[in-house]
Amino acid sequence: SKAFAMTGWRMGYVCAPKELIKIMLKVHQYTIMCAPTAGQYAALEALRSGADTNYAYVAEMVRAYDRRRRIMLDAYEKMGLHCFEPRGAFYTFPCIRSTGLTSQEFAERLLREEKVACVPGTAFGESGEGFVRCSYATATDKVAEAMARMQRFVERVRDART
């Protein structure tokens, strides 16, 4: 689903040795019976139409995501927020500890004060404290605007601490 920007559809497939597939199927069968029918048809169409165009539009999509990712990483650097470079999803996970806010405080205030949504790192476990997850699965101009707003917010928070 990621190659075709079908975010949230939870579609995918596995290529693995037969014995591993058998084990994976046991887990899968007790987790979910199958993906929703609409999702299966959408995934099938994505694969069919992608094959017809040699995945040219997928390559363009990858370039677009890379541009958005670069916008975010460059913005974090300007803000003084360390962030590892993501390599497999549409999310960044910057460290916000330097702001003095918890992940929850940062996410709530950023939403309330700048209308920018992010997910507190603690949503992914205790070790996520001090981080937030931000998505770049949206239009490039929206990513740039969100980063400008986040920078204003971070500057305001840091100024208030001094």
Briefly describe each language-model feature range:
Residues 1-162:
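PLP-dependent class I/II
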